[in-house]
Structures are given as structure tokens and as C-alpha cells.
Amino acid sequence: PFRVRGSLSSRSGLTFRVREFNNALFKLSYELSNLIVQDINYISSRTGLDEWFDYDSWAAFKQPFSEKGLVALSQSLASVMASTIGKTKKIIISDLDDTIWSGIVGDDGIDGILIGPNTPKGELFYIIQKYLLFIIKSGVIFSIASKNDNQVVSDVFKKRKGDMPINLELSSSSKINWTEKSKNIKEILLELNLLSDSAIFIDDSELECLEVETNTNGCIAISYKKSPIELIKKIDSMGFFEITSISSSDKSRTQYYKDNKEREKLIEKSDSYAKFLESLEMKTNVQWKLDKHIDRASQLTKKTNQFNLTQVSIEKEDVKSYQANNNKWIVIADLVDKIGNNGIVTVAFGLCKDKKLIIENWTMSCRVFNRGLDFALLYEILAFAKSKGLQEIHSSINKIQKNKFTHNLHELLGFKLTGKSDNKYNYV
């Protein structure tokens, strides 16, 4: 940690060599998809070098980090590991007053709230909004839950548009009323087909955060005591939105949910759900060659919870293996309709063995539930099995609380139960 040569160490000494070595590792990680480099330099900088090392511990038992450093390191490592298995958070839900702007709009008025770089306090909240925008662009869903007047809030975003990076269009679901925030959050998650343990809620009030955590199952609520920047520090240190890669689907996620709002309007106008589906004019493109979508295929097996039959996930290198092996298979599909393109939303993979096609796992994004894509993909799998001379299709499901949505899937698709053990049900 010491720069024996002072600033010269950054150009030619140990500091320089360590930095060059780390840069080489980062470059290598772009070539090797399974190599993930943990940014220790950032973690140590955030902690502070003077508080990062513990020389007494090093001298005693060769453990170089301080207690504070160990906590920061372990939190970061846990976040990276969680990201590799798709266990990062999916949605951030935000309050408004004293959370993304300074002041209470109902009391201070639209022109009275502070937001933007023109005032010190306003700039702090501007930084909050910029941070939220970066999170949204990385594929995290953004929503609003605020005790406020809906029309007043709408006017704020219109009249103060030039001062704010965030706008209402970025919110996939907004609940702006005087109802308990936990109830609004539950409605948001239900509307977006998300589980409560995939959500983070931010609010200036510790009391509101307590109410949310008490009445929702798994939603983490974060507040601040002195400065709103504490919100960023807490989210950053806990690594709730750690990612190891960004797919095209991640970048378009906000648009996907915006399109779903238009589909909901169509449902209200339709005489029946069947008529609604017909009006969508849906098309799917089933792909057995995944060269451009390897990242997305792997991601779907990790991040999907509600339509995830066996919880078996695969890495990017595994996807390539399934494509290259004649005794294995993998398939993906997108879903396009007159409203928009949902992107790649489902993946299934498995084995061909003893005249049988075995489905090892099948996952589907919650964005396209109840659209008939499960029937369409199974039809393609049946055609594939027939072309290979396979006589049976075998599948199974591990019934857990998170995939309750699919507990009756096999029966709906025409499979017959052949046996069960504990929570595992086998079908043919």
C-alpha cells in the first residue's frame, strides 16, 4: 500500500505494475466469459487505504485486511457471486419528496422544491437521480410509490423537466396516492409479475421503510439519516444491482414494460382474453442456433423465478456445449406483436437419450405469461424430437413456492404424471 517513490511509483514503481497487471486481467475477462474480475481497487478506495489494511493481523497470521476491509470485501464478493447465479435485485421503487428531490411538493409547491445543480441541496438530489438513471439503463426496472397527489406530481415532472434526469415515462408502474406504501408496492410487483424479494425501496422516512419491510415479504427498504447520498452509498456497498454483463434485453427492459401498459389497455377494450390475444397479432421466432444470444440464454436460466421448472442454470460456456453436442439441445424464442418486440423471453434445454427427448429445464420471462408461447415452443420441441426419431418427451418440475405459476403447466400442455419424489414431479 505504500508508495516508496511517491508519485513516481504510479509511473514506474510497484503501484504502476499492479495497475498494469489488473488492466491485463480486465482485458482478459472480455475474452474469457467465465472470468470475472472483482474490482478490489475500487473497494479499497471506497473504504480508504488507511482503514483497508491491518498490519498487526498480517504480522500475526498473514491476514492483510482490517475488520472494515473484510466486511467490504465479503459484501462485494457475495454480490458478484449472487450476480453469477441471477440473484441480484430486479426493481428499485422510489418515494419522491425528499428522496429524488428536496422538499415536499404539497407544501413547498412545484417551484419550491430543490432539484438540479443550481443549489447545493438540489444538486445532491440531482446526483441521486443521475444514479437512478444509470441503474435503469443497466436493465433495472424503476417504479414510484409515493404518498402524494397524482396530478401535482405529474405537473412537477412536466414543469421541472429541465432540472431532472428522471421522468415519469421511465417508471414502469407508478402508485401515487395516500395508501400505505407497502400496499402500493405489492400492487406494483403484482402488476409487473415480480416477487417481493426482487425489490428495493428507497424513502427518506425510516418509519415508512419499517412499514414496508414489515408488511412485504422480502422487499428491502433503505432510508437516510443526514444526507440523501447515503442512499447511493448503501445501494453501492451492498451491491444489490451487481451485474457481470449487459444484454440487449437489459437495455430495452423499460421499453418492454412500457409496451405492456399499452397491452393492458387493449385487454380493457377486448370482449374476451382470447380476442385480446388475437388482436395482438403475435409472432415468435424460434432459434436453435444461439450465437448472438448466448448471454441472454444463460441469463434467463439464472434470473427467471416464476417460470423455472427445475432451477437448473447454465453458464455461457455451457450454452455453447449444448449447441455443439449432438446428444444435447437448446432452443430460445422471442415474442413480437403489434405493440412491440419483447426480445428473447424463453429458453429450454436438455438431452436426447434412448429414443427420448429430456427437458432438463425450461424458463420464461414473466413479461410474456399467458400469451400462449409455452404451447408454441412445445410444438417446436415436438417437431424437433420427431425429426430426430425420438419417441417420447420427458420433463419434470421441482415444485417450490417461487415457481407456483407453473405447478400445473405439464397438465395444461398434455403431459401425464409418471411419478413423484418429495417436490419433484416427473412427466411424459
What are these regions (language model features)?
Residues E213, N217-L280, A383-V428:
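Terminal substrate-recognition subdomain of acyl/acetyltransferases
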Residues S33-L49, S146-D149, E180, S396-I397, ...:
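Acidic carboxylate-rich catalytic motifs and surrounding loops in phosphoryl-/glycosyl-chemistry enzymes
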Residues V105-L132, G218-Y224:
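Basic, amphipathic juxtamembrane/active-site segments
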Residues N285-R367:
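A conserved beta-strand-loop-helix scaffold within acyl/acetyltransferase catalytic domains
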Residues D337-K338, G343-N423:
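Acyl-donor binding region in acyl/amide transferases
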Residues P1-I93, I100-W101, G106-G112, L207, ...:
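Extracellular glycan-modifying ectodomains
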Residues I127-K158, S174-N177, R296, L309-I314, ...:
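Substrate-recognition element of Asp-dependent hydrolases with the DxDx(T/V) motif
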Residues I185-E206, V212:
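Conserved Lys-Pro-Asp/Glu-containing loop-to-beta segment of HAD-superfamily phosphomonoesterases
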